[in-house]
């Protein structure tokens, strides 16, 4: 009990205590090397403690309760892993200018991101969510350029709108529940007289972070200007906080809401396909990846809609969404870190580099025997025709296939613009190490990380041989479309 409490407490205390290193300018180099250490207690908690671990803090705010369940464990492992590998990468990536300022905002954002995942009471959850959001502004504007400041203003404006909506929704839900615990909110929201208003506020507020269509504007502006390690955690971990907010507050499993389900499936489809349409028109690698994140979160929004529409499948869909979050976060973190890698001098080294860049991208598209294939097969098994009875249900398999084609088109576009932007040179050892760990996490370690117990059997490697064609054809279709587009442009 003491060890588990200590780990949960250290997960937050260590990043906050590291701020003491910012008191003296001559400690900033030591602070840089501490960045990879800060998420270690959280990672150990996620890997060792497992569901059921909890820590009561009666003197904190209105009474704090931090802990893990199956869903939070997956989110915590992903979040801590991404911040760790990005921290390793940052040691080699960061320059001397504004180093201390970067480390301060990094530690504050990390504490908020880890805290909101573990928080089980409303006050802690919202406090950590707000800390992550507003400290993240410092990472977005770190470079201080005109473009960064513009992105920061848009980010801050959208953040304020989102936080106001979240706080209003949480207060209304808490009043209805008569409780300060997140676990009591779904049932209370389901029975509330103003359920539609509470749900709208929570969907919109968390939707800002999750990149919901029409609330996504900050994403393609912030990612290109933020330092590369910050972009990796913005897209790989922080954007998932919006999804987690939905999953722990909305009335999943309490009442079937087919109208809300239909609306979210449509919004998810718009995000998935619209993000791809806008993304393939971009010319900067990180901007393409930002739109790819919007597209991928569209698939998550689609699944949220399906879970709201049918109480019976809410639990299994939670497990599949958690698996998809783990896959997408690791792959996207690797891709973002790769944008800062210089090409080695030798041809063999360049081929190896491009292979390791391409594989996480192909995983996003569902290449067999990758984490993406596991996630997509699990989704396909649940969203097959006949499982759901709301209006948009018959279109779910088609939308998933279209999303897979859209993802592969974005992967090809990313590789094309990354090839044009790449330059030769040497990379610091810590950059190689951080990017290598992120890539290994996506391609290899994913299979040994904690998975939710309710993940369908189809997600396992043994089934991928029989499902190879269903995984391959979207990749082949997107490749054919990309080849035709390239040929058309070349002939002009």
Q: Could you describe each region identified by the protein language model?
A:
Residues 1-6, 63-72, 123, 185-193, ...:
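Interfacial loop-to-helix junctions that mark the boundaries of transmembrane helices
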Residues 1-104, 181-184, 217, 492:
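Transmembrane helix-loop-helix hairpins at membrane boundaries of multipass inner-membrane proteins
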Residues 4-11, 72-77, 261-265, 324, ...:
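Alpha-helical transmembrane segments of polytopic membrane proteins
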Residues 10-23, 35-51, 80-87, 170, ...:
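Hydrophobic core of alpha-helical transmembrane segments in multi-pass integral membrane proteins
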Residues 56-61, 185-187, 378-389, 448-469:
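Membrane-interfacial helical/loop segments at transmembrane boundaries in membrane proteins
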Residues 85-95, 100, 108-125, 135-427:
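Hydrophobic transmembrane alpha-helices and their helix-loop junctions in integral membrane proteins
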Residues 350-352, 411-492:
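Cytoplasmic/organellar membrane-interface segments at the starts of transmembrane helices
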